[in-house]
């Protein structure tokens, strides 16, 4: 981290760089989940810092716009110390993926030749034993991957086992391969290439607003959600710029996570299109045709103001109310 901060903030003194690193290192004063959420916000949005005799400013911990400025490392058997009954002990996660000295993803592996070892055991290692023994590592580690060499699944460090999913395509349009051992290569190329990894890390990890941290909801997109949100954004931009009115249609099966796909898309439109004057600060309207979808959508979106960055979220129940609501704002929300 010190190398990255010095390179991207040459005006800061060594003491000021150390203050920033100390703030990040000593982040854990709340619950484990609240600390994880706070640190993730710092990683994505930067950390506020006030240099001597200067105004407060945001200091980036990761450079998303220019990925080559970051320092990427994959470390095998990284030793993490903890204290148990007054004795210093260690844990060694199989692989940690570091960006600028921060362990953003933990990978736990099991031997496919061992008939008693499963990827569920890998999940237990992270979700039970590591959270029990080395939470101070996982505070900085939103993503988790588990694999036995045949089955490989992506999730988050707080996700239930059933919310870990395979990543079956490197790029949209690729055929889905179900061959043994292909899941490992598809995960590596589809998630862990540096540019793709930062894209997923920045905009496709979902936390509810801080007021709901007690619910401990953290998810990462599945591969259909990632590619759908990407394509929908591109289609909407093209439609708005060309004034064609052809935004596109997305078909999703029941249970595929369409509501989260819409949340990922809304975040993209709100935060990643600011340089497109035709879009600017958009007002996004989500129309549903079933009561259960309205309840599902309003429950998610009203708890996602920070994630969406769209201001107040309103549930509107009639066309007249919608007309009145839109009449009170120019854009944004």
Model-derived regions: residue spans:
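Long, charged, glycine-rich C-terminal linkers/tails
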Residues: 247, 312-321
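ATP-dependent helicase/translocase motor core
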Residues: 1-283, 288, 292-308, 329-332
């Amino acid at each position: 981290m010190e190398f990255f901060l010095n390179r991207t903030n040459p005006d800061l003194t060594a003491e000021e760089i150390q203050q920033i690193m100390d703030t990040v290192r000593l982040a854990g004063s709340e619950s484990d989940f609240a600390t994880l959420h706070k640190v993730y916000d710092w990683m994505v949005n930067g950390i506020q810092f006030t240099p001597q005799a200067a105004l407060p400013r945001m200091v980036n911990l990761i450079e998303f716009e220019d990925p080559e400025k970051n320092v990427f490392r994959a470390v095998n058997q990284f030793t993490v110390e903890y204290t148990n009954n007054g004795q210093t002990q260690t844990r060694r996660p199989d692989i940690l993926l570091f960006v600028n000295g921060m362990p953003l993803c933990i990978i736990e592996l099991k031997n496919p030749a061992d008939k008693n070892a499963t990827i569920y055991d890998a999940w237990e290692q992270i979700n039970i034993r590591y959270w029990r023994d080395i939470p101070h590592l996982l505070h900085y580690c939103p993503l988790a991957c588990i694999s036995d060499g045949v089955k490989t699944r992506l999730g988050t460090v707080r996700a239930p086992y059933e919310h870990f999913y395979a990543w079956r395509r490197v790029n949209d349009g690729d055929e889905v391969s179900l061959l043994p051992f292909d899941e490992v290569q598809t995960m590596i190329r589809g998630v862990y290439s540096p540019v793709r990894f930062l894209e997923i890390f920045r905009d496709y990890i979902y936390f509810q607003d801080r007021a709901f941290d007690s619910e401990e909801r953290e998810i990462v997109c599945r591969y259909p959600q990632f590619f759908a949100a990407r394509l929908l954004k591109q289609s909407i931009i093209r439609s708005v710029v060309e004034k064609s009115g052809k935004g596109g249609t997305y078909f999703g099966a029941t249970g595929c996570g369409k509501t989260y796909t819409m949340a990922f898309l809304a975040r993209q439109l709100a935060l990643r299109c600011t340089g497109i004057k035709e879009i600017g600060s958009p007002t996004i309207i989500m129309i549903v045709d079933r009561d259960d979808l309205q309840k599902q959508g309003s429950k998610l979106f009203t708890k996602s103001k920070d994630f969406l960055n769209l201001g107040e979220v309103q549930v509107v129940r009639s066309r007249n109310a919608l007309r009145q609501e839109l009449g009170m704002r120019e854009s944004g929300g």
